[in-house]
């Protein structure tokens, strides 16, 4: 419950902010700067917490503020290549891999594991549907399993990628059937799944019609040719022109 409250203090539960609303820093006359993800922020990521809790040696104390773990013996093949592909350090990759292998000895994560992770971090709500959508976004080839390489590449984009990279990833998440377009039904399904995951014990209390209102506002702004769908170009252009959406990219860490 506490985690949901922390999330809701800075977000309405969406992966993108409210379109057209001026950020607080802008109102105060302060120039907005894209937030830099700190190690502390990285440690708030559910998937990272899950991995590192398993990476820590048995009986040892693991601090939330410390990502690098000592005595890492596991190492994935092509570590240097992964370091080049991501924005994680070598020690971070080693730590993530150790936990990954401890939790998933086969080297693959399945959808049930994702659902278990999110049910643990969001016990006050129903995280099943959101975990399903998130898993499919990580499962690039659609084979029902996620390799470590795909896992950390996705995490790198979400946690340390550029705004453009995060927006492309968000589009892929919303594009549930992967046809290259986002429909109102698809965006509404994602929004509802996030609100369901947050549960009814959040602050401020969420209205049941909030997801639909959110989607209607976004489509009014994004669907420029009024054809009922949003393309990747419409999505990127609209989001990057909206300062509130840009600043809200940091909120990915709250539901990943």
Curated annotation (Swiss-Prot):
- List, alphabetically, the GO terms of the cellular component aspect: cytosol; endoplasmic reticulum; Golgi apparatus; nucleus; voltage-gated potassium channel complex
Q: Could you give a GO molecular-function term held by this entry?
A: potassium channel regulator activity
Q: Where is the lipid attached (S-palmitoyl cysteine)?
A: 45-46
For membrane topology, the record states: Lipid-anchor
The UniProt keyword set, sorted, is: Apoptosis, Calcium, Cell membrane, Cytoplasm, Endoplasmic reticulum, Golgi apparatus, Ion channel, Ion transport, Isopeptide bond, Lipoprotein, Membrane, Metal-binding, Nucleus, Palmitate, Phosphoprotein, Potassium, Potassium channel, Potassium transport, Repeat, Repressor, Transcription, Transcription regulation, Transport, Ubl conjugation, Voltage-gated channel
Subcellular location(s) per record: Cytoplasm; Cell membrane; Endoplasmic reticulum; Golgi apparatus
Entry-annotated residues carrying Phosphoserine:
14, 60, 63
Q: Which InterPro entries match?
A: EF-hand-dom_pair (IPR011992), EF_Hand_1_Ca_BS (IPR018247), EF_hand_dom (IPR002048), Recoverin (IPR028846)
> Where on this protein does the Glycyl lysine isopeptide (Lys-Gly) (interchain with G-Cter in SUMO1) crosslink form?
26, 90
Residues bound to Ca(2+) 1 are 175, 177, 179, 181, 186
Give the start-end ranges of region Interaction with KCND2. Answer: 243-256
A biological process (GO) annotation for this entry? regulation of potassium ion transmembrane transport
Record domain EF-hand: where: 67-123, 126-161, 162-197, 210-245
Entry superkingdom: Eukaryota
* Entry binding sites for Ca(2+) 2: 223, 225, 227, 234
PTM comment text = Palmitoylated. Palmitoylation enhances association with the plasma membrane. Proteolytically cleaved by caspase-3.
Note down the stretches annotated as region Disordered.
Answer: 1-30
Spell out the family assignment given in the record's similarity comment. Answer: Belongs to the recoverin family.
Cite the record's note on assembly: Binds to DNA as a homomultimer. Dimerization is induced by binding to calcium. Interacts with the C-terminus of PSEN1 and PSEN2 and with PSEN2 CTF subunit. Associates with KCN1. Component of heteromultimeric potassium channels. Identified in potassium channel complexes containing KCND1, KCND2, KCND3, KCNIP1, KCNIP2, KCNIP3, KCNIP4, DPP6 and DPP10. Interacts with KCND2 and KCND3.
Q: What does this protein do?
A: Regulatory subunit of Kv4/D (Shal)-type voltage-gated rapidly inactivating A-type potassium channels, such as KCND2/Kv4.2 and KCND3/Kv4.3. Modulates channel expression at the cell membrane, gating characteristics, inactivation kinetics and rate of recovery from inactivation in a calcium-dependent and isoform-specific manner.
Q: What is this protein called?
A: Calsenilin
Query: Coding gene?
Result: KCNIP3
């Amino acid at each position: 419950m506490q985690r949901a409250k922390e999330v809701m203090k800075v977000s309405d539960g969406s992966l993108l902010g409210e379109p057209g609303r001026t950020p607080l820093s802008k109102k105060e006359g302060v120039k907005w700067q894209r937030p830099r993800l700190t190690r502390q922020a990285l440690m708030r990521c559910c998937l990272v917490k899950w991995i590192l809790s398993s990476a820590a040696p048995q009986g040892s104390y693991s601090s939330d503020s410390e990502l690098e773990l000592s005595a890492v013996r596991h190492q994935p093949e092509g570590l240097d290549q992964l370091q080049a592909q991501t924005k994680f350090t070598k020690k971070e990759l080693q730590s993530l891999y150790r936990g990954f292998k401890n939790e998933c000895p086969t080297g693959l994560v399945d959808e049930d594991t994702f659902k278990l992770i999110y049910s643990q971090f969001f016990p006050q709500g129903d995280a099943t549907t959101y975990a399903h959508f998130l898993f499919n976004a990580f499962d690039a080839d659609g084979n029902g399993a996620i390799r470590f390489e795909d896992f950390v590449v996705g995490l790198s984009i979400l946690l340390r990628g550029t705004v453009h990279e995060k927006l492309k990833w968000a589009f892929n998440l919303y594009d549930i059937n992967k046809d290259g377009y986002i429909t109102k039904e698809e965006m509404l399904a994602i929004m509802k799944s996030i609100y369901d995951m947050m549960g009814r014990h959040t602050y401020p209390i969420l209205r049941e019609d909030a997801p639909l209102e959110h989607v209607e506002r976004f489509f009014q702004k994004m669907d420029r040719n009024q054809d009922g769908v949003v393309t990747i170009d419409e999505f990127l252009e609209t989001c990057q022109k909206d300062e509130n959406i840009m600043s809200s990219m940091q909120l990915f860490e709250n539901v990943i």
